[in-house]
């Protein structure tokens, strides 16, 4: 009883024959604990798989974002190829270890928080057990992204630093933290935090909203409660496309502020950074630099992420049911 599960017991009927009492019943507290754990595990795996798949494109995008060089698909290809020739194939994943250190807790927290915010908002608005209406659906995604960002932000800054510097400058993640703290102060670990949060709110809100809405519409029109994996990939790709397009200028601003210590610029505020970028490079070429690459990278990453999360959740729930039955 203490573990939240009632075990099946064998009793005797009045006529002396054996009778099996009710099957195991899992308490609400135990079910919620399992749900949170499953969400954390599924989210962690989803983030790791998605980010590793697009790491070379992500690194290339960051390098262009923090420089004044004009972006084009041709120049991006040249950069990737030149990096491969000079530093080797695995160098295309430079900084990915820092990415994993950040993205695994980030994705775990974000997906888990999203599930919990959906329940909380569903209870508050009276939609418990059914799909949320559009505004709570958007709010659940925005809150989930904000929660994860607040907790894991310094790891994102470290990833950006490692992506744009030669490997001789920083040997590992701990070295980045120590050197930044010593040379630039502890406050530098949260440089660019404000534009990051302001960008995450529309990005996470729109991404989760789009994905959940497409799944809801699919269920209504197809009669199937669960989409096929390729349909999940497509829904996730649309979610990534819309979410990243809406928040991209703030993504450029945060990268400039995060890497100011190694690029020679002194970006101090969001407005000041935007003004300097626009003055030097223009609106489209500056604030939307690398967006075309994000239209390739983003939908792929988000599609893989949402699909991996959903399928892992389904698998873990099936395994949990089997485990409960065997008890």
From Swiss-Prot:
Q: Is Manganese a UniProt keyword of this protein? A: no
Keyword DNA repair assigned to the entry: answer is no
> Cellular location of this protein?
Mitochondrion inner membrane
- Look up the domain of life of the source: Eukaryota
Q: Which PROSITE patterns match?
A: SOLCAR
Q: Which reaction does it catalyse?
A: ADP(out) + CoA(in) = ADP(in) + CoA(out); 3'-dephospho-CoA(in) + ADP(out) = 3'-dephospho-CoA(out) + ADP(in); adenosine 3',5'-bisphosphate(in) + ADP(out) = adenosine 3',5'-bisphosphate(out) + ADP(in); AMP(in) + ADP(out) = AMP(out) + ADP(in)
Q: Which Gene Ontology biological process is one annotated for this entry? A: AMP transport
Tell me which UniProt keywords the record has, alphabetically.
Answer: Membrane, Mitochondrion, Mitochondrion inner membrane, Repeat, Transmembrane, Transmembrane helix, Transport
Family annotation (Gene3D superfamilies): Mitochondrial carrier domain
Q: Which InterPro entries match?
A: GDC-like, Mit_carrier, Mitochondrial_sb/sol_carrier, Mt_carrier_dom_sf
GO molecular-function term, one example from the UniProt record = ADP transmembrane transporter activity
Q: Which residues cross the membrane?
A: 36-56, 92-112, 138-158, 189-209, 233-253, 296-316
Q: Which SUPFAM superfamilies match?
A: Mitochondrial carrier
Solcar repeat ranges per the UniProt record? 34-120, 132-217, 227-315
Topology with respect to the bilayer = Multi-pass membrane protein
Quote the function comment for this protein.
Answer: Mitochondrial carrier mediating the transport of coenzyme A (CoA) in mitochondria in exchange for intramitochondrial (deoxy)adenine nucleotides and adenosine 3',5'-diphosphate.
Q: What is this protein called?
A: Mitochondrial coenzyme A transporter SLC25A42
Output the lineage of the source organism: Eukaryota, Metazoa, Chordata, Craniata, Vertebrata
The gene from which this protein is expressed is slc25a42
């Amino acid at each position: 009883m203490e573990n939240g599960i009632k075990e099946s017991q064998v009793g005797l009927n009045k006529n002396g024959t054996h009778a099996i009492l009710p099957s195991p019943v899992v308490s609400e507290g135990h079910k919620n604990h399992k749900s949170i754990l499953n969400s954390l595990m599924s989210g962690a795996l989803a983030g790791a798989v998605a980010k590793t798949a697009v790491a070379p494109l992500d690194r290339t995008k960051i390098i262009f974002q923090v420089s004044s060089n004009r972006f084009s698909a041709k120049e991006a290809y040249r950069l990737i190829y030149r990096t491969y020739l000079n530093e080797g194939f695995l160098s295309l994943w430079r900084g990915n270890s820092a990415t994993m250190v950040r993205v695994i807790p980030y994705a775990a927290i974000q997906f888990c928080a999203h599930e919990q915010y959906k329940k909380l908002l569903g209870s508050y608005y009276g939609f418990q057990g059914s799909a949320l209406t559009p505004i709570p659906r958007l709010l659940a995604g925005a809150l989930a992204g904000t929660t994860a960002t607040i907790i894991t932000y310094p790891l994102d800054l470290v990833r950006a630093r490692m992506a744009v510097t030669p490997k001789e400058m920083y040997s590992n993640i701990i070295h980045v933290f120590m050197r930044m703290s010593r040379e630039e102060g502890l406050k530098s670990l949260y440089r660019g935090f404000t534009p990051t949060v302001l960008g995450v709110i529309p990005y996470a809100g729109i991404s989760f909203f789009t994905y959940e809405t497409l799944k809801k519409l699919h269920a209504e029109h197809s009669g199937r409660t669960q989409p096929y994996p390729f349909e999940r990939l497509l829904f996730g790709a649309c979610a990534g496309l819309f979410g990243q397009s809406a928040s991209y200028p703030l993504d450029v601003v945060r990268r400039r502020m995060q890497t100011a210590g190694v690029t020679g610029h002194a970006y101090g505020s969001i407005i000041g950074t935007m003004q300097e970028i626009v003055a030097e490079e223009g609106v489209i070429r500056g604030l939307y630099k690398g967006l075309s690459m994000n239209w390739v990278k983003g939908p792929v990453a988000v599609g893989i992420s949402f699909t991996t999360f959903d399928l892992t959740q389904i698998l873990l729930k099936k395994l949990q049911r089997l485990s409960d039955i065997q008890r």
